[in-house]
Swiss-Prot record:
Predominant place of localization: membrane
Pfam families to which the protein is assigned, alphabetical: Syd
Keyword annotations from UniProtKB, A to Z: Cell inner membrane, Cell membrane, Membrane
CDD domains cross-referenced by the UniProt entry: Syd (cd16323)
Keyword Cell inner membrane: yes
Function comment: Interacts with the SecY protein in vivo. May bind preferentially to an uncomplexed state of SecY, thus functioning either as a chelating agent for excess SecY in the cell or as a regulatory factor that negatively controls the translocase function.
Name of the protein in question: Protein Syd
Localization in the cell: Cell inner membrane
Name of the coding gene: syd
One GO BP annotation of this record: regulation of protein-containing complex assembly
GO cellular component, one term: cytoplasm
Sequence similarity: Belongs to the Syd family.
Membrane-topology annotation of the record: Peripheral membrane protein
Length: 181
């Protein structure tokens, strides 16, 4: 496990939860995750769940993605998706507003790996360098990704070579995120 990335993710999650506590006097609330089982759920309303991050259980790797492509995935991606269970968190990096993706449960972790495989299949078909997404943007065709060759974080337009460098590594990126509520 990449300790710098794990600590940066935990630190951002703490900043996010602290900001939520400050503004709402509660743990984060999600309507999107209502009805989806998770160890993160601490209470439920009639249409939403309150959640708090929990330690990841299970194998701490995305080896299913590696096996599917017979490639080695950046260690930071293994760490990013297996440090904790949590709800997705809204954030800002510079002037970019994003939703930082997280695994909600072991079932969700399997789904995330399937989506990463699908993303890599498309990139391979289009002969694009491999990236692994970590966040979504309001524009549906744009994501925040980690380049699997260099480890740098970029804003990427899906299906194209258009990429904008954001940070040299994932820990640096996470350390610069500001929570958005």
């Amino acid at each position: 496990m990449d300790d710098l990335t794990a600590q940066a993710l935990k630190d951002f999650t703490a900043r996010y939860c602290d900001a939520w506590h400050e503004e709402h006097k509660s743990w984060p609330l999600s309507e999107e995750l209502y009805g989806v089982p998770s160890p993160c759920i601490i209470s439920t309303t009639e249409d939403a769940v309150y959640w708090q991050p929990q330690p990841f259980t299970g194998e701490q790797n995305v080896n299913a993605v590696e096996r599917a492509f017979d490639i080695v995935i950046q260690p930071t991606i293994h760490t990013f998706y297996t440090t904790q269970f949590a709800g997705d968190m809204h954030a800002q990096f510079g002037d970019i507003k994003l939703t930082l993706l997280q695994t909600w449960s072991e079932d969700d972790f399997r789904r995330v790996q399937e989506n990463l495989i699908g993303h890599l299949v498309t990139q391979k078909r289009l002969k694009l360098p491999p990236t692994l997404f970590i966040a979504t943007l309001e524009e549906e065709l744009e994501v925040i990704s980690v380049c699997n060759l260099s480890g740098e974080v970029c804003k990427e337009t899906l299906g194209t070579r258009k990429r904008t460098h954001l940070a040299s590594n994932l820990a640096e990126f996470l350390n610069q995120l500001k929570p958005l509520l």
